[in-house]
Amino acid sequence: MTVMSLTATLMAAKKAKGMSFADLEAAIGLDEVWVASLFYGQATASKEEAEKLAGLLSLDAETTAALQEYPTKGSLEPVIPTDPLIYRFYEIMQVYGMPLKDVIQEHFGDGIMSAIDFTIDVDKVEDPKGDRVKIVMCGKFLPYKKW
């Protein structure tokens, strides 16, 4: 099963059941962003997690098995995103990527922020001038090793 067909199958099942990613988070105990990443072929479910989702969404055996495969992460096309919301993240990194890198290295030293030992939370912040999106990323700092 391709990532595109897996995503289409999962999204159709979620829609048919009238569920949101927040509903799935509550039902299986995994964060809604992580569940969404699973739907887009960017995460791997354990057998138990895949079976819970299969029960909730009435998934067949092939789809349930595909949820447990190890994905090729970060393989979304095209390289420069064209979806307006996703492009904003690309634009944010174009504008703030180097400044963030410098500030992080001033605080922690030479290294990177893990996207493996990592969480991301999305919240809605009510504002009279227009609601705001609040995204909090929390990744373990990994210093570069000298040898």
Curated annotation (Swiss-Prot):
InterPro entries referenced in this protein's UniProt entry, alphabetically: Cro/C1-type_HTH, Cyanase, Cyanate_lyase_C, Cyanate_lyase_C_sf, CYNS_N, Lambda_DNA-bd_dom_sf
Catalytic residue positions: 88, 91, 114
GO biological process: cyanate metabolic process
Reactions accelerated catalytically: cyanate + hydrogencarbonate + 3 H(+) = NH4(+) + 2 CO2
Keyword terms: Lyase
Lineage top rank: taxon: Bacteria
UniProt GO MF annotations: cyanate hydratase activity; DNA binding
One Pfam family in the UniProt entry: CYNS_N
EC number: 4.2.1.104
Signal peptide interval: none
Entry's family note: Belongs to the cyanase family.
Function description: Catalyzes the reaction of cyanate with bicarbonate to produce ammonia and carbon dioxide.
PANTHER family in alphabetical order: CYANATE HYDRATASE
The protein, known as: Cyanate hydratase
Organism: Parasynechococcus marenigrum (strain WH8102)
Gene assigned in the entry: cynS
